[in-house]
């Protein structure tokens, strides 16, 4: 491979060894993230089965979401291609050919729509985000399509992405009319059917499953990246046993979700979002209020059976250690199992959820009859609740129930933990930014009754005493002072300004397609270089190909639209006398699909693969992983995020962070800090939320990632929290992240947060401890300098931010 050190990438289109190796890993990661939701003996399919492959995602499988979470990889494998690679007997070629033509026509029309809309807005990305591509329906499935079939594989795909929430309508959250007709037709013809859901989040299936008997298997594949089709084929034909587990509850009805009709655009109010459900998010709500879901949190089937046996439980001041033995009790298939541990807390005092995830571990691959012993550590703070009035995290005296299983719905009460006296785990200061939130009525009386039931059962189970100690506070180390004049330091407060304002993909100067860079204004005088940033979290987002003017040695730009959809919207233009370079990055599974592996070792491996590509393409900071909570299934960006549970999200993000940062010169940027839970009006929506809910649900994952992974950077979110933009919030950036958690890295804004008139205020970003405004524009510089001259912004505040930035540059450059 011909590698150029001045310009990133290669002049050759040859597939390099790194691409081959990373494709192998991407396939393995995709396989582990696939969740088997139903199987009535249909899977795995026999190799010689005659299959009707149908549905809009069969040949046009969605590899990932749109926007900054997309990856411009070389090529992706569809489910059709993956099955053809295994010489599957596909008998529906005519249907697939017809759909291919419909799809291409729809794409052409959509492209024209985007180009026209882009003429009438300041930022072309706004036109793109406001008009997401909707995959067209296929023609009706007929007898001719299935007459030779012994089974059907029907693929439902959904596109979602940055800038727009999913819609509560047919063809998005619900099945389209044509999908319903096709699936009922297959049922009437008694064709055993595998239903595959290829979407960034749930699709409602309750009525379909109630009205059919021949949908014998369901796979939730999420969006699996470039090797998705191969991974699905491996699962379908039994070459890999599914081991993925849901990280988000699938409800029977959308209206079962807490505050369902108050989300985003549904109540007609995009200015404020009332977090009225409080701590009852996802399974915490369904489990506490007794609402049965379609598929529970942590659920996922296998081709084999496992037995999970409690072997011991011990405690020390740091936490509880549960020892379990897992045995593959099947006779045919090897497989992996996830052991999940939930805790029930005392219900007297502050209201609490019925159960919460406090620990988990995944086995290695076990052959039939093989066993593995797991020691699962449940950290002390996982048992704590936040008390607003006392401003402390407290582990309450009383009995705690330990539930063990392979999903929330299958977890059994297995042991008890007794705490003799209240323990203050951490003392905090009251946040200045707050709102009065009217939360939904809790179910305290019912939870107390259920607590009496499970505490009585503890008498027949193993019990241990637990005496936790107050959490040791990590001290935030201030970086060394610099003697550089304060006026010269101000350019560090914003990014390396390109000639255009952009949302993504067009702010990079040195590496085409990167998101942006720190300022290099201090390079000539002080020798301080810039750091280069690239989007994620499903890989490295770069421009796949670009041209360099030989004479001027400058890169030909493509603009915002050229950075989207792998260049599809503007096409490729070859300039005379130019040299062309290629940047072939790997499209790994999206965040949700990776998280469905429940495999911390795999996540750390993933981080190391990302770091290898960062080094190859001269990237210092990866703008990932995404840690926002799956608060509602309609959030358009859920595919980037891991889970509805902060403990799971935080521990997985910490693993990815350790993987990336194991390679010198590579750092992560965990995002979006915090409450980035809707895309419609994402830059202006104000999240009204109680301090307890904020700390226990929406900040907890970030806290775990900071303390266990030590990320180099954090990205603040666009939205307001209790009336204050996240990038302007001293509560978030300084009091919580630095003073409470000991975070000593850099905090940067999301892109263009200061551009809207009612957006974040540049100088307040600096005062709050949001060190860098990205991607930077001249107005940011003027606003900060004016505030400093007027005394609103102090020299100390500027130097604090600058010193943190300089420390990071020294570490990564």
PLM segments and residue spans:
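Glycoside hydrolase catalytic-domain context in secreted enzymes
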Residues: 1-386, 392-410, 425-813
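Short beta-strand edge segments in extracellular beta-sheet folds
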Residues: 416-426
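Short amphipathic beta-strand/extended segments with alternating polar/hydrophobic composition
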Residues: 361, 413-418
